[in-house]
Amino acid sequence: MEPRYPFVAVDVPEPEADEIGALLFELGASGVEQRDEQTLVRGARSGQVTLVASFEDHGEAMEAIAALGEQSPPLAARLEEVVGDAWRDAWKEHFAPFALTPTITVVPPWAERAPEREGERVLLLEPGRAFGTGLHATTALVAELLDEHAAELRGREILDVGTGSGILALVALLLGAERAVAIDNDEDVIEVVLENAARNGLEGRIEASAGVVEAVTRRFPWVVANIEARVLRPLAPELARVLEPGGWLILSGILESERDDLIARYTSLPRPLEHVATRPDPASPGGDRRAGRGDAGGEGWVAILFRAPGGAASSPG
């Protein structure tokens, strides 16, 4: 008889997916997949995603369901079973090559290919258990801003706070950054970052470690942080501290309704940053929806570009 593998599925608001995904790992999940309407998962309403977590045995899965039901507000999770081993690679069907920016195409390792057009850069990426495939708007908006400012980025160093799969640090390196420092408070994702760097021949130009921005002791000309607005707000003094004079900061993981508060916070610091630009998600209402992008219940995402006062952070040479 073929084995039966237990999974826990729970529908959650998209802005809360990262937090609840982390909770599932704390409850013993060995992997968590995030699906939205574009992956044709039944049960997920508009503005929601379905988290599907794998567990080693049915007992752990049932304990996780009970724990989710005790959250405030309660989360209604359900047990799903998959017979046989085909599930192990089934998620790969939903991760095909796609254009992340006008010049960078994300390609999974099982679909490896060479660049197909002039100026195209291929980024080989497997997220593993880390956040960051590039399909989510919060990641793509940062990548697009980096691409647009490639001239200022070229030859510089970048700090990626909350790196996940390492996708933004690797994008920066492909665009010409000299070196990337990637940190995350989840030590389990660091191996994923280094593996993705090696896939792209970039392992000699990236330093990845578990840590928090408060422990960073030097400044950078570029800093990116794709986290959540509720985390980015209290981090404002620290993110400004690690910016060189004239340095650039990109924040993402921000809903449109949170934009003004974040801008006010970062432009009113003792060493205030200049608000340079806000980039909206083209999948938000009134924008052009692109494959692989999702909205948050009708509310779009934004990324915000700031610059520190002081000397120029222009491209050398």
Curated annotation (Swiss-Prot):
Single GO cellular component term: cytoplasm
Domain of life: Bacteria
Residues binding S-adenosyl-L-methionine, per UniProt: 139, 162, 184, 226
Enzyme class: transferase
Pfam families (UniProt xref): PrmA (PF06325)
Region named Disordered: 274-297
Gene3D superfamilies in UniProt: Vaccinia Virus protein VP39
Family: Belongs to the methyltransferase superfamily. PrmA family.
Descriptive protein name: Ribosomal protein L11 methyltransferase
Record organism: Sorangium cellulosum (strain So ce56) (Polyangium cellulosum (strain So ce56))
